[in-house]
Amino acid sequence: MSPLALVSVSDKKNIIQFCKELIENFNYKILSSGGTAKHLIEAKIPVIKVADFTNSQEILGGRVKTLHPKIHGGILAKRTDEEHQIDIKANDLELIDLVVVNLYPFKKTIDQGAKWEDAIENIDIGGPSMIRSAAKNHKYVSVLVDPSQYQNFLEESKKGELKESYKAKLALEAFQHTADYDTAISNWISKERGFQSSKHIKSYPLIKSLRYGENPHQKAFWYGLSNIGWNSAKQLQGKDLSYNNLLDLESALTTVLEFGYAEKDELTTDTFASIILKHNNPCGASVSNSASQAFLNALECDSVSAFGGIVAFNSNVDSETAIQLKDIFLECVVAPSFDEKALEILKVKKNLRILKLSKDQLPKNNQTSTKSIMGGLLVQDTDDNKEKSEGWISVTNKNPSNQMNLDLNFAWKICKHVKSNAIVIAKDQKTIGIGAGQMNRVGAAKIALKAAGKLCSGAVLASDGFFPFADTVELANEYGIKAIIQPGGSLRDQESIDMCNAKGIAMIFTQKRHFLH
């Protein structure tokens, strides 16, 4: 008896050729319905219509096509079970050997901003039911859910009877397919109706296995969405991205996004930003009138730490900037665009990873961050990139000058992306000292102020958390700091305010903290 394939696909890529090969090489009969049947018939492929197979017409405007005992009985029947054999004969079931199904494009529908009713109609019911039935009975039935599986199935079939291990792998991929589909639906309903979900469910396909994790003895994998973020970035040259590269690129990019992100010639004067990052901490940052000057300014902050670092730009990288970049060892450079001449210059550094990530490849919606803990996950909103000065208050007798306000705003944005406890010293829209990841705030201040040294005179200081004591203000004064920005909120705020007033230092409270762990 000829094997029977049930074919019902939304994505019709390669389906005609696949069905032709099933018929010509393996003597399959094709069972199909709706748009798939029409598509195959138009291609002169013989098809048994589901309505004729079940002797039951589609109802409810096509909502019920394949939800029928003759379909699911044919898929779920155990070939060697005596009781099943009795039911097969009693119900005149024809066994189905292959299920080829992919689902209504729900993700595509909601990504296009579909209305609630339209999205609901694009929730597939019959498809997941057939996929799950076939996957459950994979000992006897093969299930294909993606056109990329067709060729491999044909090659395996040429070897003779399909191995159980191969069919089990297909079943795994099928259940992952339906799980991903249900995840998209549940997350969409939660978002649309503002419900707090009782379960945190996310589905990310495997992008690739990485060489190793943070250290060579750790395995690592990269999962993500195919149409957004780093997986959609175009790597123009260089070695494969590592686990650490991806972590650092993410930190560098989120920092530079504080200052806008634009294609060539779209930025206004003095908004070109460059961030140099090492081990998930900025080691230099600047905003200037060109990308090349911004990079040079950032490099001046800590040229030693920049060695082997990551550089991010919020603007096009031109040849002048490329000349500056090629003179030091870097792991990665990311920007929205690169001039052809710049790429020619950078090609001499064959191992340098160059990534082009355009503005339309950035996430459009608010994101969440996730951290693993023993037995669970911590999920929070990301610390958004829209830092505004509304709500900031001057708490001292002296107010910052216009230039100081620019520097305070700049330093505050950078400080947000430095590991806590964090202190950033800035002057003329560039960092001159950064103290990161210290267990006490004055310790971070000592590192940042010592790094900046004499350049501190007239500079500003930013702190990601409040001052528990006035010691940080006292230390800042010794180095010549003239303005401070911090969240405020300490029980001893007045001591810091009094110290600022006594030393002639301006201080701003943002009333917003930016811890980063």
UniProtKB/Swiss-Prot annotation:
GO terms for molecular function: IMP cyclohydrolase activity; phosphoribosylaminoimidazolecarboxamide formyltransferase activity. It catalyses: (6R)-10-formyltetrahydrofolate + 5-amino-1-(5-phospho-beta-D-ribosyl)imidazole-4-carboxamide = 5-formamido-1-(5-phospho-D-ribosyl)imidazole-4-carboxamide + (6S)-5,6,7,8-tetrahydrofolate; IMP + H2O = 5-formamido-1-(5-phospho-D-ribosyl)imidazole-4-carboxamide. SMART domains: AICARFT_IMPCHas (SM00798), MGS (SM00851). Residues 1-145 form the MGS-like domain. It holds the Pfam family MGS. The keyword Hydrolase applies. One of its GO terms (cellular component) is cytosol. Its EC number is 2.1.2.3, 3.5.4.10. One of its GO terms (biological process) is 'de novo' IMP biosynthetic process. Pathway: Purine metabolism; IMP biosynthesis via de novo pathway; 5-formamido-1-(5-phospho-D-ribosyl)imidazole-4-carboxamide from 5-amino-1-(5-phospho-D-ribosyl)imidazole-4-carboxamide (10-formyl THF route): step 1/1; Purine metabolism; IMP biosynthesis via de novo pathway; IMP from 5-formamido-1-(5-phospho-D-ribosyl)imidazole-4-carboxamide: step 1/1. Keywords: Hydrolase, Multifunctional enzyme, Purine biosynthesis, Transferase. The IMP cyclohydrolase activity resides in the N-terminal region. Belongs to the PurH family. This is Bifunctional purine biosynthesis protein PurH. It comes from Prochlorococcus marinus (strain MIT 9215). The gene is purH.
